[in-house]
């Protein structure tokens, strides 16, 4: 395989400023991709752009986007086409976890928090798909971020789990709709990944799980995953090495669910 398998390919990413999105952007840049990066954190996007252009000598544009707002998402994708002339792939990785995760059940669910979590995670993915599929090149590829919580239920996790289940439904629907154009749509389902979002979630409940502790999940590999490891999966699904994979929800959880 070429060390630059994404040369001349244009890839759009949401959630690019931190965690899995950040590591995916860096990996794709190292493999020659031309990137259109979106996030709500504009300063961090600019830092990533400067680092990717300097280190990998690739073309990068950035846009501050609230994925809950379709107008902003569509304007970002139109900007991508204006700058690069095409869109070969996208990774919709923007996401948030609720402050009440692990603390409040459905009866106690704050509805403003519900709307925010569903808005970013589920509506944000829908908005991204809607804008991207209007312009996606034939034989393109899209990766959406679901979660282990999109595959299994968990108490006191209503908004996040519902959103992540919904993303799998969106992914399967999109795959059926655009398969005739050779466009593939898949979902990744990470487990415990060491990211700022995981740290924030654990801080909110005052519980920091450590491998080997009594309350650590039954993860076969006995550790948290790294964002770089998930980025490798995203890159594979965007690449020409996965051309017969579509409509899939792929776990990357260290053997948590097995």
Swiss-Prot record:
GO molecular function: oxidoreductase activity
Pfam families xref list: adh_short_C2
Inducing stimuli: Constitutively expressed at a low level.
Pathway assignment: Hormone biosynthesis
Key words, A-Z: NADP, Oxidoreductase, Virulence
UniProt-annotated catalytic positions: 146 (proton donor), 160 (proton donor), 164 (lowers pka of active site tyr)
Biological process, per Gene Ontology: abscisic acid biosynthetic process
EC code: 1.1.1.-
Positions that bind NADP(+): 20, 66, 130, 160, 164, 193, 195
Record CDD domains: SDR_c (cd05233)
InterPro entries linked to this entry: NAD(P)-bd_dom_sf, Sc_DH/Rdtase_CS, SDR_fam
Flavoprotein in keyword set: no
Stated role: Short-chain dehydrogenase/reductase; part of the gene cluster that mediates the biosynthesis of abscisic acid (ABA), a phytohormone that acts antagonistically toward salicylic acid (SA), jasmonic acid (JA) and ethylene (ETH) signaling, to impede plant defense responses. The first step of the pathway catalyzes the reaction from farnesyl diphosphate to alpha-ionylideneethane performed by the alpha-ionylideneethane synthase aba3 via a three-step reaction mechanism involving 2 neutral intermediates, beta-farnesene and allofarnesene.
Family per similarity comment: Belongs to the short-chain dehydrogenases/reductases (SDR) family.
Name recorded for this polypeptide: Short-chain dehydrogenase/reductase aba4
Species, as recorded: Botryotinia fuckeliana
Gene behind the chain: aba4
């Amino acid at each position: 395989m070429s060390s630059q398998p994404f040369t001349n390919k244009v890839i759009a990413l949401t959630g690019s400023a931190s965690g899995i999105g950040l590591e995916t952007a860096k990996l794709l840049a190292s493999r020659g991709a031309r990137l259109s990066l979106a996030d709500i954190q504009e300063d961090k996007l600019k830092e990533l752009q400067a680092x990717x252009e300097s280190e990998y000598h690739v073309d990068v544009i950035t846009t501050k986007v609230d994925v809950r707002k379709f107008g902003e998402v569509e304007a970002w994708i139109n900007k991508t086409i204006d700058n690069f002339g095409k869109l070969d792939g996208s990774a919709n990785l923007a996401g948030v976890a609720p402050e009440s995760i692990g603390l409040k059940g459905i009866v106690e669910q704050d509805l403003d928090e519900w709307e925010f979590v569903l808005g970013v995670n589920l509506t944000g993915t829908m908005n991204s798909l809607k804008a991207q599929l209007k312009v996606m090149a034939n034989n393109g590829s899209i990766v959406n971020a679901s979660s282990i919580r999109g595959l299994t239920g968990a108490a006191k996790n209503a908004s996040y789990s519902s959103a992540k289940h919904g993303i799998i439904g969106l992914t399967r629907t999109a795959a059926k709709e655009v398969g005739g154009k050779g466009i593939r749509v898949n979902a990744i389902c990470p487990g415990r990944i060491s990211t700022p979002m995981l740290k924030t979630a654990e801080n909110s409940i005052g519980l920091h799980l450590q491998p080997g502790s009594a309350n650590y999940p039954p993860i076969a590999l006995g550790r948290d995953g790294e964002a770089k490891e998930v980025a490798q999966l995203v890159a594979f699904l965007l690449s020409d090495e996965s051309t017969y994979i579509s409509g899939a929800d792929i776990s990357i959880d260290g053997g948590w669910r097995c």
